[in-house]
Amino acid sequence: WKIRAIPFPSKESHEMNPVILKLKKKIKYRIDMSFLSNAYKDASKLSSQIISYGNKQFKVKELFSIKGSDIKNIIIKSSVDLMDNIGKGLNNINITVHGNVGYSFGEQMLSGKLILYGNALDYAASGIKGGSIFIYGNSGDYTGGKTNHGNIGIVDGFLYVKGNIGNNSIERMRRGNVIIEGNIGDYACNDMLSGTIIIKGKIGKIFAEGIKRGTIFTKDKK
């Protein structure tokens, strides 16, 4: 059990020159932020990446102000819940987000670190295969569970949530470690195959049904 070996991050960045993104203006359409998970040669390649917004296409630098040069360490400031897929498939990159995020935060992450100082919508940390995710807020349904197009939950990695998580969370977990400080919704931890889960708050209905192996710690006696 390796939870104690996971270093919890501080809120201040210690990177020398991280890439910092901030929206230039308020948005009204959803943005697919999965482009941040690409392997860019330098920050100029990132800023020139074409993304869709509404029914048009823009370069990243047209929607976001960008500064810094370390593309392995990214900070997003003033994030909003219209920004989906941040850290999706992330591999060997660290992303820190200040604000709320949309759907599929860290979905199928491979390695690296994701830190969120805000709330996440559904499917956060779904199907992750490695790395560490820290959510210092609440997270929606299917957190740490199956992706919206698959049937496998957490394969490996570490997930920490400071607040509450929603229904159908941490389903079909295969390996990894999870800590939930708050409450957990209905139909959670079902069909667990292995891994370790700590839940400090209350648990919902139909909890840990079909569990085969693994360890769950909870204070809720029901």
Annotated model-derived regions:
Residues 1-222:
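Long, distal/terminal scaffolding or interaction modules
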